[in-house]
Amino acid sequence: MYTSGYANRSSSFPTTTHNAALTATENAAAGLVSEVVYHEDQPMMAQLLLLPLLRQLGQQSRWQLWLTPQQKLSREWVQSSGLPLTKVMQISQLAPRHTLESMIRALRTGNYSVVIGWMTEELTEEEHASLVEAAKVGNAVGFIMRPVRAHALSRRQHSGLKIHSNLYH
């Protein structure tokens, strides 16, 4: 597992090593588009998973764009989460049909290290491919946040990546 320079900020890494590590992480993440499906009643789980990566991406000189459906990000929450307040940009009350198009345009520009958008429906293969291509062009990361109700998850089985931890073995 890669440990970021941010996590080791108290260490005495030379600046060039630190910058090389950040560049390696940026290049490895280029073109990454991931969907985060979470329970509506447990949004903290998604935050716990994403915050370390968002903090690391916040070290870049580029913006972080949040395309939120209705809620406005709290200034206090952004600061307490360790995200760079001066690099977080938000567009709220965006209609779901415009979120995908906005994400593609934002990812493609290269102005954002990460673009986070909320979707209510699953993406088609074509939509996902468009996001991945835009993220590669802009050397950016995209996160699709998709809240689901607890009873909706129990009705069907999802295939996906299982992350094993030696904490439980």
UniProtKB/Swiss-Prot annotation:
Annotated stretches, region: Lon protease binding: 162-169
Gene3D superfamilies named among the record's database cross-references: P-loop containing nucleotide triphosphate hydrolases
Keyword hit for Cell inner membrane: no
Modification after translation, per record: Is rapidly cleaved and degraded by the Lon protease once DNA damage is repaired.
GO biological process: division septum assembly; DNA repair; negative regulation of cell division; SOS response
Induction summary: By DNA damage, as part of the SOS response.
Spans annotated as FtsZ binding: 106-112
Record's keyword annotation contains Magnesium: no
Matching InterPro entries: Cell_div_suppressor_SulA, P-loop_NTPase, SulA_CellDiv_inhibitor, SulA_enterobact
Record's keyword terms, sorted: Cell cycle, Cell division, DNA damage, Septation, SOS response
Site (Essential for degradation by Lon protease): H169
Subunit note: Interacts with FtsZ.
Function of the molecule: Component of the SOS system and an inhibitor of cell division. Accumulation of SulA causes rapid cessation of cell division and the appearance of long, non-septate filaments. In the presence of GTP, binds a polymerization-competent form of FtsZ in a 1:1 ratio, thus inhibiting FtsZ polymerization and therefore preventing it from participating in the assembly of the Z ring. This mechanism prevents the premature segregation of damaged DNA to daughter cells during cell division.
Family: Belongs to the SulA family.
Protein name (record): Cell division inhibitor SulA
Taxonomy of the source species: Bacteria, Pseudomonadati, Pseudomonadota, Gammaproteobacteria, Enterobacterales
Gene that produces this protein: sulA
